Every structure is written in structure tokens, then in C-alpha cells.
């Protein structure tokens, strides 16, 4: 039995992604019986095709090279095992359930805030991905220039984000935006999986951050990942009750790296995995700086009625071990 799922990267607005339980970042998932199973590929390499239609200033060959660099960046994560294989150019369009993973341009003027989107065909008996397509919206202007091009979005940056979806990651909330005419502008992003793209001409999105690396390693981790990295588990509570949908951020006092997770149960439980050994400051904050629907289904029941709060102690994470029973207490606004 199969089903289709989708996730998107937007220019100034957001779209639904499905969350799997209890992990740093968010992982895409599907219901298997009464539980949510993380989406993942059963076998590598992921074999993909490129649609043979180019756009202004981007030939199919240039597009394929940029897509290949995006896959290579994910493959370069030392604590995760992924690989890909470009099979060839085809006339087939993305977003068609035909058993082939196709990446290409499509003109979608009706989606005037969607830069690109990823869809899946999933085996709902076990959560394995059978096919995943990515479309880039040719309504926008695109570039593959090494240093970016003014007034054009960078193919490689957007590809890195969408390939993260293709591999099973959802969105990260590690970023800051400001309201501008027509939507929000990204000021800073600490994850390639942040759901709003950098502005035209910007190529900062070509780089993975600690949160992305922790996420992909959680899904496809190497033995070294389990051996060398630790986790923090606990709850976010308000007046003694769990807070659902809180964003919990771990800040490494030595490294300065940020890895984050969410409370995904009524009990307010969270787990942040993929942490280097060391000490961390923990912060819980509401998802009130954007569209909640870019992270959770509309009926998930996210609580945003609380103030930012910090755990009252620095947390020491051992190499290959975990810290449990952390409680971050928040108060209503």
C-alpha cells in the first residue's frame, strides 16, 4: 500500500509537513497502524532522473550539476550513510507517481510563493520511500552562477533543502525572519531545512548546519554516530502540564552550535539527538514567529501561549550517552 506526501520551500510563506515523533529537528513521517513511522529510503543509492527542460540561464546540464552538488553535500556528512545516482535526462515530469524519482522545472504561477516542492510515494506499511520527485517553479528566475546572481534564486541552495526533504527531513525552526512587504525575509538561518529561503542572489543556503547534520545522521547514522554523539531528553511544562509543539534549542557552550527539537506529545516530551559531548544551554520557545503549518498539521494542537524560558542549569552531555528527565518550566504570556 502506498501514499503520497509533499513538502515545499517557500519564498515568503509556508506549507504543511508531516512530523515524526521524538527527534531533534523534524523528520517526515507516515502513520503505520497507530504509530508514526519516520520516512526513509530502504536502499541506496537513490536513483534520480532530470527532466530535460531548462529555463533562462539554466540548461538541463547545468541544472543537473547543481542538483548533483546538493546530493554530494548531504553525502559528505561523515556520520550519515547516503548516496545517489544520476540516471539520465527524461521527458517525464516531476510530481507524477510513475515509479521514477524525477527532478525538474515546472511553471506553476498559481503557486506564487512556492520556490520548489518535494513529493513522495511511500510504503505505508513500513514508512519506506519508494519514489520522490522535486519540482522547481520556473515562474521564478533561477541561477547556477558560482557567486549567485542578483534578482535570481540559487538552484544549488534550494536543491540542498529539497534533497533534505527527499531523504526524509522536514523543516527546522532555527532561523530568524522579519516582516517585509509581501511576506517575511530571512535574517539568519541555522539550518538548510529552515522553511523560508534566503533572498535572491544569496548563496548562504549551500551549506549544512549542525541541526541538518544531526537530523540526517539520526535517520541514516553510522556506527560512529551512535558511539560518539549523545542526546538530551525531557519535558516542557506549564503549570505542571505538558506543552505540545514547543521549540527546544540546545546551544553548545564550547562549539556555539545549535541543534533543536520539538515537544511532540501531550506530555511535552522532547529528545534532541546528535549532540557532541560537552555542555549545553537549553531554551524553550513558542512557534510564534511564522506559520505553524510549515511544521505541523493544522490539527496537531501547538501551544504558543507561553514565554521563552531557559533550563535552570547547564546540561553536560557525555560522549555516546544521554541525559534524561530534564524539565523546562514555562509560564503563560
What is the meaning of each model-derived region?
Residues 1-10:
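Bacterial N-terminal signal peptides that target proteins for export
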Residues 20-333:
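Zinc-dependent metalloendopeptidases
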Amino acid at each position: 500500500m502506498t501514499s503520497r506526501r509533499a513538502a515545499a520551500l517557500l519564498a515568503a510563506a509556508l506549507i504543511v509537513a508531516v512530523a515524526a515523533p521524538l527527534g531533534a529537528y523534524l523528520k517526515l513521517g507516515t502513520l503505520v497502524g497507530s504509530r508514526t513511522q519516520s520516512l526513509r529510503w530502504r536502499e541506496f543509492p537513490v536513483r534520480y532522473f532530470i527532466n530535460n527542460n531548462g529555463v533562462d540561464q539554466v540548461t538541463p546540464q547545468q541544472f543537473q550539476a547543481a542538483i548533483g552538488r546538493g546530493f554530494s553535500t548531504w553525502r559528505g556528512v561523515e556520520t550519515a550513510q547516503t548516496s545517489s545516482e544520476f540516471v539520465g535526462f527524461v521527458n517525464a515530469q516531476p510530481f507524477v507517481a510513475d515509479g521514477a524519482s524525477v527532478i525538474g522545472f515546472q511553471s506553476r504561477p498559481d503557486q506564487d510563493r512556492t520556490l520548489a516542492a518535494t513529493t513522495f510515494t511511500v510504503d505505508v506499511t513500513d514508512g519506506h520511500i519508494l519514489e520522490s520527485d522535486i519540482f522547481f517553479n520556473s515562474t521564478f528566475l533561477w541561477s547556477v552562477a558560482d557567486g549567485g546572481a542578483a534578482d535570481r534564486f540559487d538552484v544549488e541552495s534550494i536543491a540542498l533543502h529539497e534533497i533534505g526533504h527527499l531523504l526524509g527531513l522536514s523543516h527546522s525552526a532555527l532561523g530568524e525572519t522579519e516582516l517585509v512587504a509581501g511576506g517575511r525575509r530571512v535574517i539568519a538561518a541555522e539550518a538548510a531545512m529552515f522553511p523560508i529561503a534566503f533572498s535572491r542572489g544569496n548563496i548562504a543556503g549551500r551549506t549544512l548546519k549542525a541541526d541538518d547534520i544531526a537530523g540526517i545522521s539520526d535517520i541514516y547514522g553510522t556506527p560512529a554516530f551512535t558511539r560518539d554523539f549523545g542526546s538530551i531528553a525531557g519535558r516542557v511544562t506549564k503549570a505542571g502540564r505538558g506543552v505540545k509543539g514547543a521549540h527546544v534549542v540546545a546551544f553548545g557552550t564550547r562549539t556555539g552550535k545549535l541543534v533543536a527539537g520539538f515537544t511532540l506529545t501531550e506530555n511535552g516530551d522532547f529528545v534532541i539527538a546528535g549532540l557532541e559531548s560537552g555542555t549545553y544551554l537549553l531554551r524553550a520557545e513558542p512557534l510564534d514567529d511564522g506559520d505553524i503549518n510549515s511544521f505541523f498539521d493544522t490539527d496537531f494542537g501547538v501551544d504558543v501561549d507561553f514565554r521563552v524560558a531557559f533550563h535552570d542549569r547547564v546540561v553536560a552531555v557525555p560522549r555516546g550517552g544521554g541525559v534524561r528527565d530534564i524539565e523546562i518550566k514555562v509560564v503563560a504570556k
